[in-house]
């Protein structure tokens, strides 16, 4: 943001931002335009009618004319004031709505973005930076409506001022005024108008200079705002309450809270606000006052010379001063436009992240017999930005309709294997085949439909239970109920008065139901069953369940999965006994593959090592054995 910003680029990026905001809220800008126009002309309406009333009082004093001017002034001013108030409420309501709708731009981008980019830390950091910019300084997308309203108001103010002051310059001083006739010289008038404009521009430049300092402290402000956002509300987080009390973490929170002084008087931001930012801003305001002085002197001299009456003095002074203020604000907004453009660049860097994953066009064959065969052929993969391989030369073929267990220590590549299978990532080496065809050649959405997955870090929404299971607002209630029953959630479902309509969690409903980790896992499993895909994948799906509940789930799954191909990932090797084949991962490679009994027979193998390490905690020992 410290790079020189061209006005053309700044204008272009703001037009794009306005177009994006108009796309999510088509009523805001028309409403804001109407409100701004009415608000901008209201001061000039007051000035105009005040001048006419004073003129009549000072000159002819005709009661009927005076009455008409008063009535017209009251009516016009009142109508404009009422219209402004009504339009203000409407515009503010739409602005609040726009704040929420603006987030859909980022949501839609996340939804359509390649998962590989969603998973990148750089992407998360960029999105956080955009949010922090908006939180601490309001720069970014939501600065665009403000710039639009202020710029439009300034332009209307300038045009209105010109309309009301044009006769200030064209009304001649009578020849009888002597030396004051010099005020009629076009060159003098041109110089005066030029000086007023230059002073207004200078004031705007000073305000622009003050605003430019904010981008210099963006990094400090962002960090400080993160500290505030995290530590300022940590006590309200119900999941942290117990730890805070058990370990006196409030002392640690206070330490970091008090240690951050970026916004304090002694911090960098505070020093700038009290120093150059405040200084330049005050200087700009002071410079504008010079214009008022010039206007008063010029207007009074012409009135003294007899160019116009006292009523016109009121009109010219008020209109010229307001016009100069509009020029000042317009110049300041043009500077703000350039400052905000840097923040908008960050926004569009995020929104313009390209989808680089190849999108095929083949459709996956809809087979009633579920005869899909998947093969990993010499597949190697490493995460973006990493030099170490997460998977190395993995080759494996899934037997259709069988149960495959994938085991291994943490970091061995199990979850990465599943992400590649679901094509959340593409491998750097090798290929993955579906019925003999590279999966990259299939239509992506079509390919995804053949998998039902329960990830270990699954998420449920704060929505009705049935909608969580179906992933849709419209769904088959009988099918959703059966899926929950098959997943072992039947007893809990029966205890819910609203059944499938029970709202999960209390984010949006006071009568929302909190579910335990184990219950949430059962709902996630039910969601996978409801999809009824040919492949069902469970990545640590029972980590929050006790061993008995886990065994029940796996026993049911053998019956539930039917002719589906099922893949299990679990640290509890007891689940492997339900599977037809087991693949053992270590350091990104498949080092063993076979049945439970066959792998146990390999006493020096990794599987036997893991099995016996867990079995000792479940094997009943005699007192003598325990002592030994």
Functional labels for PLM-detected ranges:
Residues 422:
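Helix-to-loop junction immediately C-terminal to a conserved catalytic motif
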Residues 1-41, 64-68, 87-91, 123-159, ...:
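Membrane-integrated ABC transporters
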Residues 1-15, 96-142, 223-269, 341-354, ...:
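Extended non-transmembrane interhelical loops and adjacent amphipathic helices
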Residues 433, 490-523, 532, 617-628:
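ABC-fold ATPase nucleotide-binding domain signature/coupling loops
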Residues 431-433, 448, 466-510, 554-555, ...:
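ABC ATPase nucleotide-binding domain helical subdomain, centered on the C-loop/LSGGQ "ABC signature"
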Residues 30-83, 157-211, 306-310:
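Transmembrane helix-loop-helix hairpins at lipid-water interfaces of multipass membrane proteins
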Residues 498-499, 555, 562, 572-628:
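C-terminal portion of ABC ATPase nucleotide-binding domains
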Residues 295, 313-353:
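Cytosolic ends of transmembrane helices, especially the final helix of ABC transmembrane type-1 domains
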